[in-house]
Amino acid sequence: MMFEYTQRAFETQYSIIKDILTNDKNPNVYPIAYILGGQPGAGKSNIQRWLKQKDKNIIAINADDFRVYHPLFFDIQAKYGKDSPKYTQPFINKITERLIDELSDKKYNLIIEGTLRTAEVPLKSCLNLKQKGYSVELNIIRIFL
C-alpha cells in the first residue's frame, strides 16, 4: 500500500494517544464501561459528554478521534480528501482495539463509541469486559424519522 507506516511510528502515535487519554484518570476496583452505538448524527457524542460530566474519571474511546494521529494523515488527506477515512481506517481500528484491551486490563472506566454496524463487535466487547470484571451498559441511539 502507498501509505504504509513503520511499527515504530505506530507505537509512537499509540503512546501519545494513550498518555492523553489516561492523563488524570485512575483505574477502578469496580470498573464500568458504556458502549454507545448508533448512526452518525444520532447523538452518541451528546451522551458521551453527559457521561463524562457525571464521572470525571472516565476515558472515552472514539476511533474517529484518532484519525489525525495516523503517521501519514496529512499526506492521505491531501491526496484523498473526503475519501481519506477509508485509508486511515485500519490504523484507527488497530489503535482502538489496543486501547480497549490495555485500558480494560488496567480497569479504567470506559466509554466506547461506535456505529454498531454489526452485532458481533459490541457483543464480543461486552463479553470481554464482563470477563475482566466490568459492569457494562450497552446504549443504542437511533434517529427517528
Language-model segments: what does each one mean?
Residues Y34-I35:
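Short hydrophobic/aromatic beta-strand immediately N-terminal to the Walker A/P-loop
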Residues Q39-P40:
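The conserved Walker
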Residues G43:
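Conserved glycine(s) of the Walker
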Residues I47:
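Hydrophobic positions on the alpha1 helix immediately C-terminal to the Walker A/P-loop
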Residues I58-N128:
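Conserved nucleotide-sensing/catalytic segment adjacent to the nucleotide-binding pocket
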Residues D24-P31, L103-S104:
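Phosphate-binding P-loop
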Residues K130-L145:
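Conserved phosphate-donor/acceptor-positioning beta-strand/loop module used by diverse small-molecule
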Residues M1-K25:
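N-terminal pre-Walker A segment at the start of P-loop NTPase domains
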